[in-house]
Curated annotation (Swiss-Prot):
GO BP field: aerobic respiration; menaquinone biosynthetic process; methylation
Lineage: Bacteria, Pseudomonadati, Pseudomonadota, Gammaproteobacteria, Enterobacterales
Record-given protein name: Ubiquinone/menaquinone biosynthesis C-methyltransferase UbiE
Record-linked Gene3D superfamilies: Vaccinia Virus protein VP39
Keywords, alphabetical: Menaquinone biosynthesis, Methyltransferase, S-adenosyl-L-methionine, Transferase, Ubiquinone biosynthesis
Pathway(s): Quinol/quinone metabolism; menaquinone biosynthesis; menaquinol from 1,4-dihydroxy-2-naphthoate: step 2/2; Cofactor biosynthesis; ubiquinone biosynthesis
Free-text function comment from the UniProt entry: Methyltransferase required for the conversion of demethylmenaquinol (DMKH2) to menaquinol (MKH2) and the conversion of 2-polyprenyl-6-methoxy-1,4-benzoquinol (DDMQH2) to 2-polyprenyl-3-methyl-6-methoxy-1,4-benzoquinol (DMQH2).
Superkingdom per UniProt: Bacteria
PROSITE patterns hit by this protein: SAM_MT_UBIE, UBIE_1, UBIE_2
Family according to the record: Belongs to the class I-like SAM-binding methyltransferase superfamily. MenG/UbiE family.
């Protein structure tokens, strides 16, 4: 039984073999990539932009620094970081999903954001970067889709410079029971219908809702970050705990 648990993981509410999850998640994001930005605005009523703005404000990123926007998708954070680091800095937009990475590259180039941004297809569990390389790493709404989160956190710790910080922006556990019930009703009954109407894909958005429920809560993720080596780990609850921003440092 213990051996079986070591070889399985969650895909939404389903239990699947670990080697299957990466491909299953890939199919979800191949499917949603083209409508990803539109669906983000619809699903969150545009509030995701405020959550991301808060993340940027907490990053402490300065001119000349090197930033990794991990699971960066369509590049919302990368666009902001590109301006902050300036010509002497560098932003790496990394994503495991080719379709999402392509959408991000096309969107940023259309905006004229070139020169200090590079694009890398990478698995968070085995980042292809040198030790002590980045001043700041962000992973926004991506960690819950990673098969082995502890391994990914250790990989992020390795490539972060001493003195650098990791910011994890992710859906979490609402603080109040009435909010939690309303959020569940929205996520499981309304969200898949929006996905069907706008993206002709209810199943992918049902998975996204389920993956949120299976993600570690605020205190559990804090402990996971500390176990990976991060220090001074704190978190801020946003929108009543629907989302949390975790921050940790490497010293």
């Amino acid at each position: 039984m213990v051996d079986q648990e070591k070889e399985t993981t969650h895909f939404g509410f389903r239990t699947v073999a670990k080697e299957q999850k990466e491909g299953m998640v890939a199919e979800v994001f191949h499917s949603v990539a083209a409508k990803y930005d539109l669906m983000n605005d619809l699903m969150s009523f545009g509030v995701h932009r405020i959550w991301k703005r808060f993340t940027i404000d907490c990053s402490g990123v300065r001119r000349g620094q090197r930033v990794l926007d991990l699971a960066g998708g369509t590049g919302d954070l990368t666009a902001k970081f590109s301006r902050l680091v300036g010509e002497q800095g560098e932003v790496v937009l990394a994503d495991i999903n080719e379709s999402m990475l392509r959408m991000g590259r096309e969107k940023l180039r259309d905006k004229g954001i070139v020169g200090n941004v590079s694009y890398v297809q990478a698995n968070a569990e085995a980042l292809p970067f040198p030790d002590n390389y980045f001043d700041c790493i962000t992973i926004s709404f991506g960690l819950r889709n990673v098969t082995e989160k502890e391994k990914a956190l250790r990989s992020m710790f390795r490539v972060l410079k001493p003195g650098g910080r990791l910011l994890v922006l992710e859906f979490s556990k609402p603080l109040l029971e009435p909010l939690s019930k309303a959020y569940d009703a929205y996520s499981f009954h309304i969200l898949p219908k929006i996905g069907e109407l706008v993206a002709q894909d209810s199943e992918s958005y049902r998975y996204l809702a389920e993956s949120i429920r299976m993600h570690p809560d605020q205190e559990t993720l804090k402990s996971m970050m500390m176990d990976a080596g991060f220090e001074n780990v704190t978190y801020s609850n946003l929108t009543g705990g629907i989302v949390a921003l975790h921050r940790g440092f490497k010293f």
